[in-house]
């Protein structure tokens, strides 16, 4: 891979599919079935074992670092449960590896049938010491690369002790079996990666195996599988607890409803009294509203009636004043008429005393009578007009 391709892959891993605004790369999402879920969780065997003796080639599903970055961002807000798919994938792969290991062990067992159990135990002891030495040497290399010289020196001391034990175990094993069969019993199977190991391999070769990419890759896959099992078990336990909690809540609600229905059926009077109180409170509130409305209406009516009564009283006072003025005028007129009448009567008496003295007096008397009759009719007309004005 060129430096440019490496930089592009690093940017995809950091920023996702939309780092350059390229919409064509967003046609497939990380949740698509075509995407490898083990790759999203960084545990696909095709990636881990690439470049080793057991290279599996390219995965049948899509591998994209940008999709992994998208998944890591989205998984912080939502759980997609991709651990189940990855766990199934790794379980099938490890099962195949364990099956190959068992087959290799059976093949070796067929060639070693004539070896006694005691000799097999001695050979197993030599194999164990070889594995221990190889792991210690791999650890020494790792510590030396990190610059931890003191720790690496301590581990080298342990390596020397293990080598001494190995030499003793090889000597015991060599003396316990004939030379012809000793050369045949030089292989064993690695329990981790199912690779064959020589019984008489030197320390350098054993260190290369136990510190190699193949062996470490299988260790990584097995550790990742155990981690996924633990995560899946925790999530399933959490989900079961949530389901149990929801079920308990539903059962509690059902029991509460049943208890309420039973209480209503047992105590109908109480329910009726409650309904009666509710109805009574509602009616009282309605009555209060009606009273407030009626009070407001009465206030408005009183205000209007007061204003109308004030206007009526004013008009009545005006009419009273006008009627008083009219009555005063009438009384004045009547008093004047009575004076005139008295004067006329006095004159009539004088005329009677001197009755028929002259024709001039007769004419004067007739004029007075006609004048009095005219005054009487005009007085009646005025009184009727005044009466009508008073009624108005």
Curated annotation (Swiss-Prot):
The observed outcome of changing residue 269 to R is:
Induces a decrease in lysyl-hydroxylation. Abolishes lysyl-hydroxylation
Q: 5-hydroxylysine (modified residue): where? A: 266, 269
Q: Name one GO biological process term.
A: mRNA splice site recognition
Q: Name one GO cellular component term.
A: U2-type prespliceosome
Consequence when changing residue 266 to R: Induces a decrease in lysyl-hydroxylation. Abolishes lysyl-hydroxylation
Q: Where is the composition biased (Basic and acidic residues)?
A: 235-257, 337-364, 377-392
InterPro entries recorded for this chain?
A: Luc7-rel
Q: Which GO terms describe its molecular function?
A: enzyme binding; mRNA binding; RNA binding
Pfam families listed in its UniProt record? LUC7
Give compartment(s): Nucleus speckle; Nucleus, Nucleoplasm
Q: Which UniProt keywords apply?
A: Coiled coil, Hydroxylation, Nucleus, Phosphoprotein
Residue span of region Disordered: 235-392
Feature: compositional bias, Basic residues: 258-321
Coiled-coil segments on the chain, per record:
102-177
Which of the residues bear the PTM Phosphoserine? 18
Keyword Coiled coil present in the record's keywords: the answer is yes
Instruction: Give the multimer and partner information.
Output: Interacts with SCNM1.
The protein's matches in PANTHER family, at most eight in alphabetical order, are given as: RNA-BINDING PROTEIN LUC7-RELATED
Which family does the record assign? Belongs to the Luc7 family.
Q: What does this protein do?
A: May bind to RNA via its Arg/Ser-rich domain.
This protein is called Putative RNA-binding protein Luc7-like 2
> What phylogenetic lineage does the species belong to?
Eukaryota, Metazoa, Chordata, Craniata, Vertebrata
């Amino acid at each position: 891979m060129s430096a440019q391709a490496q930089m592009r892959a690093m940017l995809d891993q950091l920023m996702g599919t939309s780092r350059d605004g390229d919409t064509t790369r967003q046609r497939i999402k990380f949740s698509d079935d075509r995407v490898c879920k083990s790759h999203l969780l960084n545990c696909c065997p095709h990636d881990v074992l690439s470049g080793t003796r057991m290279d599996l080639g390219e995965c049948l599903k899509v591998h994209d670092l940008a999709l992994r970055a998208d998944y890591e961002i989205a998984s912080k807000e939502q759980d997609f449960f991709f651990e189940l798919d990855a766990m199934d994938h790794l379980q099938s792969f490890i099962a195949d590896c364990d099956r190959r290991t068992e087959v290799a062990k059976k093949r070796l067992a067929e060639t070693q049938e004539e070896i006694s159990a005691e000799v097999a135990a001695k050979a197993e002891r030599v194999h164990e010491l070889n594995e221990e030495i190889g792991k210690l040497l791999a650890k020494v290399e790792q510590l030396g690369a990190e610059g931890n010289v003191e720790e690496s020196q301590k581990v080298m001391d342990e390596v020397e002790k293990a080598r001494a034990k190995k030499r003793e175990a090889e000597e015991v094993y060599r003396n316990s079996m004939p030379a012809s069969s000793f050369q045949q019993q030089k292989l064993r199977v690695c329990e981790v990666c199912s690779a064959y190991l020589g019984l008489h391999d030197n320390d350098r070769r054993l260190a290369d195996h136990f510190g190699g990419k193949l062996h470490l890759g299988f260790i990584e896959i097995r550790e990742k599988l155990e981690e996924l099992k633990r995560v899946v078990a925790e999530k399933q336990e959490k989900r079961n607890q949530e389901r149990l909690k929801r079920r308990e809540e539903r059962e509690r609600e059902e029991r509460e409803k049943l208890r309420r229905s039973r209480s209503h059926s047992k105590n109908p009077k109480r329910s009726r009294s409650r309904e009666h109180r509710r109805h009574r409170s509602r009616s009282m509130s309605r009555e209060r509203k009606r009273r407030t409305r009626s009070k407001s209406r009465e206030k408005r009516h009183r205000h209007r009636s007061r204003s109308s009564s004030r206007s009526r009283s004013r008009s009545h006072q005006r009419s009273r004043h006008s009627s008083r003025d009219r009555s005063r005028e009438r009384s004045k007129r009547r008093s004047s008429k009575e004076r005139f009448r008295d004067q006329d009567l006095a004159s009539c008496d004088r005329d009677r005393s001197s009755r028929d003295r002259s024709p001039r007096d007769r004419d004067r008397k007739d004029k007075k009578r006609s004048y009095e009759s005219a005054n009487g009719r005009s007085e009646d007309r005025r009184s009727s007009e005044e009466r009508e004005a008073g009624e108005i």
